[in-house]
Amino acid sequence: MGNHFDKVRLKKVEIILGPTGVGKTEFAIKKALEYGSPVISCDSRQIFKEMTIGTAVPDASQLAAVKHYFIHSNSVGEDYTAGRYEIEAHRLVKELLEMGHERLVMCGGSGFYIDAFVNGLDDFPPADQKLRAELTARLREEGVGALAEELRALDPESCEVIDLSNGQRVLRALEVCLMTGRKFSSFKTSPKRSHDFRIEKIGLMRPKEKLYSRIDARVLKMIDEGLVEEVRGLIPLRDRPALQTVGYKEIFAWFDYLDGKVSTEGWGPTSPGDGPVTTLERAIELIQRNSRRYAKRQLSYWRRDKSIVWVENI
């Protein structure tokens, strides 16, 4: 029994993380091919099958080259949480290691999902559907800024790490605070989970100017690939929290303007002073800006984690 445990302990999960646009997908596929491993995604948006272009899902050739898990595995209509990901990802890793894999590659930019996998989570309460419907209605009518201010009053610590332009994140944090009377941050991950395998985190980075240039170019590529049409097809689902995110909310705001629904917040850029999104060009500018801001927040979140080995991905 001890020998079996020692052998399992030699196995490793390598987590490739980093800001949006840094090149995680290509790096992870290269590692996976080297190890003979699949890629386990830890991206909270790529998990939804209706969101392809705006989430930079690996293309057909990349998906054909290496088996991927947690890509397009669920619907935007589902309430998918980090707690559920923790359970399902651990179950998958256990199965893959028992199949004989010595090294596994995990890849993504969702810090909360990564923390859930590595450290575990306290038991979050299940969603209260009535409260969620009320908050979703407020999100649409008042904008994410109003919900973020309420969250700040209840849990300022969470506001330091949550992407306050992401309606899904803000709504869930506020929902937990209102349901439990506890701060959402009090449910955060803590280093308590033990593993029968080693974990190594590799953080990818690039010089800021190069990273931002890549982000801007990638947004233009998304537009060329049909992002506007993808978002148009999601209008019936636009109330879903998963769609209150960069790349989708800005185009929804443009659609609203075209339909005569002028709004400066909510479905739009969510930053004071942005004004209505009157053109596609303005929507593109805001997606680029909000993506750069998101990359900056991701890096700030991970700089506190001293276990990450940072590599310049040139």
Name each model-derived stretch:
Residues M1-I314:
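Phosphate/pyrophosphate-binding catalytic cores of soluble transferases and nucleic-acid-acting enzymes
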